[in-house]
Curated annotation (Swiss-Prot):
Amino-acid positions noted as binding [4Fe-4S] cluster 1 in the UniProt annotation, renumbered to this chain: 13, 16, 19, 145
Domain 4Fe-4S ferredoxin-type, chain residue ranges per copy: 4-32, 57-89, 90-119
Alphabetic keyword roster: 4Fe-4S, Electron transport, Iron, Iron-sulfur, Metal-binding, Repeat, Transport
Phylogenetic lineage: Bacteria, Pseudomonadati, Pseudomonadota, Gammaproteobacteria, Pasteurellales
InterPro entries per UniProt: 4Fe4S_Fe-S-bd, 4Fe4S_Fe_S_CS, DMSO_DmsB, ET_IronSulfur_Cluster-Binding
Cofactor(s) needed: [4Fe-4S] cluster
Protein name in the entry: Anaerobic dimethyl sulfoxide reductase chain B
Pfam families: Fer4_11 (PF13247), Fer4_2 (PF12797)
SUPFAM superfamilies linked: 4Fe-4S ferredoxins
Gene3D superfamilies reported in the protein's UniProt record: 3.30.70.20
Cofactor remark: Binds 4 [4Fe-4S] clusters.
Length: 205
């Protein structure tokens, strides 16, 4: 089994959300379901110095995240029907025909990848554009990015090319589920577990 994964360049990303919208359009998703989400992590403050001048250490950067098709997915472990599973090609997918919509997978996933579709009455999620990949194409989010901040390939190739870093705030540490994700950190990036910043767009994600 050749495991695929995503690469994300946080230095290039401007938070335009083209990847998110391309996914919604391609998958015909409703307003309440987002398979790919853009997180804005921001922080810092202004401090007045003794001479009256102001000094700032404000920072902000974006993270584009979908399902990471983890090596040790938490979502599959809690699914009572086996609907959420990792297929032979390494993609974590949901069998919508047997999913009962209990949302345990959503509660277990540290990346909020499984999404409940109220119209369908069961869970849905990013499938890595499995059909496109099988035909030799990239996922729609990767092809849509105008800054080429996303890539998708066998994870061993991505790690050889870009490194292994993926524990970037506001994401959780990688040892929880071993995500098949590589991140090129923004110059302002903080490591997972950082408390100096906060999520700047909580209602969007």
């Amino acid at each position: 089994m050749e495991q695929y994964g995503f690469y994300f360049d946080s230095e290039r990303c401007t938070g335009c959300k083209t990847c998110e919208l391309a996914c919604k359009d391609y998958k015909d998703l409703g307003t309440e379901v987002n398979f790919r989400r853009i997180y804005e992590y921001t922080g810092g403050q202004w401090n007045q110095q003794a001479d009256g001048c102001w000094h700032q250490n404000i920072f902000a950067y974006y993270m584009s995240i979908s399902c990471n098709h983890c090596a040790d997915p938490a979502c599959t472990k809690v699914c009572p029907t086996g609907a959420m599973h990792k297929n032979a090609d390494g993609f974590v997918i949901v069998n919508e025909e047997i999913c009962i919509g209990c949302r345990y997978c959503h509660m277990a996933c540290p990346y909020d990848a499984p999404q409940y579709d109220a119209q369908k009455g069961h869970m849905t999620k990013c499938d890595g554009c499995y059909s496109r990949v099988k035909s030799g194409q990239k996922p729609i989010c990767v092809d849509a990015c105008p800054l080429r901040a996303l890539d998708f390939a066998p994870i061993d190739e991505l790690r050889t090319k870009y490194g292994t870093q993926a524990s970037i705030a506001p994401l959780p540490p990688t040892d929880i589920t071993q995500p098949n994700l590589v991140v090129k950190p923004n110059k302002y990036a903080r490591l997972s577990g950082d408390t100096s910043g906060f999520l700047g767009n909580p209602r969007e994600v």
